[in-house]
């Protein structure tokens, strides 16, 4: 069982020079605006640290969090960071600001060697959107041998049972499923504990 020993906010940044030092392995959370990134991070860390905006795409900062997890089963304690990226597909942003914003994010993902895992949140109700395909392709062009990419489907509990089963069978692997409270809808769907164990495994495979 994984116990969350600590989780806290570090800082927000809109420029590479403002980002905190890379002292631990890092996990990046990315996805379209309004896909549920804040809810996912807060549930994952067991604290309401990530703030969501009522206006999709309003948040223009990369937010950094630190957390310490204790894996009781393996007698292992690990500290790592979570980077919450601004949602993409945003609206009402000037072209110059959009270009500057995208440049910062691309530079951040390209040069920050402490990033070990990319978590791409995808709305289970809207699969195969071009914007998600492009995001996946862009991230995969950046991947080094010590990094991993993982899809995680949000709003899974809003699908009917047939849609859930179809997604579970046909979605590209590897992937995880995030329900509203991470309660398993049946024994074959991952619980919060399984999600945490899976993410920790990826982070520990290529430690900083």
UniProtKB/Swiss-Prot annotation:
InterPro entries registered for this protein in UniProt: G_ENGB_dom (IPR030393), GTP-bd (IPR006073), GTP-bd_ribosome_bio_YsxC (IPR019987), P-loop_NTPase (IPR027417)
Binding-site list for GTP: 31-38, 57-61, 84-87, 154-157, 182-184
Top-level division of the source organism's lineage: Bacteria
GO cellular component: cytosol
Record keywords: Cell cycle, Cell division, GTP-binding, Magnesium, Metal-binding, Nucleotide-binding, Septation
Cofactor(s) in the UniProt record: Mg(2+)
Annotated positions binding Mg(2+): 38, 59
Alphabetical list of PROSITE patterns matching this protein: G_ENGB
GO biological process assignments: division septum assembly
Domain EngB-type G: from-to ranges: 23-205
A single GO molecular function term of this UniProt record: GTP binding
Family named by the database record: Belongs to the TRAFAC class TrmE-Era-EngA-EngB-Septin-like GTPase superfamily. EngB GTPase family.
Protein purpose: Necessary for normal cell division and for the maintenance of normal septation.
NCBIfam families hit by this protein: GTPase_YsxC (TIGR03598)
Name of the protein this chain belongs to: Probable GTP-binding protein EngB
Naturally occurring in which organism (per UniProt): Helicobacter acinonychis (strain Sheeba)
Name of the gene encoding the protein in the UniProt record: engB
